[in-house]
């Protein structure tokens, strides 16, 4: 996927928080610490691994492809790639009102580690807290190789 196709998919998946631009994807992909995972043309995940810690930067699954396990596969692959890159822990931020994503992350073993008050804005312009979730990583072999 190119930065343009990544931005187009992201725009189909997000209204709030705002979707990322082609330029933002291009900048991130130029960073050697950032890695991209895709599921066909329906799913993407960007992660970054540095100093023993991996961050799930964004995940997007096309609306018509949801509830088919793509998000679960992307998160599993993120955990595997994070461990391969030397991370022993992972973290992410999720909007408190994004129940589907929170469920996905809880099933993947993430647990609350903090809160960023008013970090996001919803479609009405109201502040929404970001929940910081984290989990420890085990051997990469425990997460599958894809």
Language-model regions, residue ranges each:
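Conserved catalytic core of the tyrosine transesterase superfamily
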Residues: 95, 124, 129-136, 146
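Conserved active-site tyrosine of GNAT-family acetyltransferases
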Residues: 105, 110, 133
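Acetyl-CoA-dependent GNAT
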Residues: 3-68, 72-85, 135-146
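Conserved GNAT acetyl-CoA-binding A-motif
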Residues: 82-93, 104
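Conserved catalytic-core motifs of GNAT/GCN5-like acyltransferases
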Residues: 93, 111-129
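Short glycine/proline-centered loop/turn elements that form peptide/ligand docking sites
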Residues: 71, 75, 97-101, 118-124
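Conserved functional loop/turn residues at catalytic and ligand-binding sites
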Residues: 58-60, 65, 69, 86, ...
């Amino acid at each position: 996927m190119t930065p343009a196709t990544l931005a187009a998919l992201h725009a189909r998946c997000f209204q709030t928080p705002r979707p990322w631009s082609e330029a933002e994807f291009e900048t991130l992909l130029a960073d050697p610490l950032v890695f991209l995972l895709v599921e066909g043309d329906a799913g993407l995940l960007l992660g970054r691994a540095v100093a023993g810690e991996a961050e799930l930067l964004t995940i997007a699954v096309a609306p018509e492809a949801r509830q088919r396990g793509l998000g679960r596969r992307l998160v599993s692959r993120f955990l595997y790639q994070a461990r391969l890159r030397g991370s022993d822990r992972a973290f992410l931020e999720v909007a408190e009102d994004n129940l589907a994503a929170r469920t996905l992350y809880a099933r993947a073993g993430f647990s609350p580690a903090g809160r960023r008050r008013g970090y996001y804005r919803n479609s009405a312009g109201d502040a929404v807290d970001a929940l910081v979730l984290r989990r420890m990583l085990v051997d990469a072999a425990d997460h599958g190789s894809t």
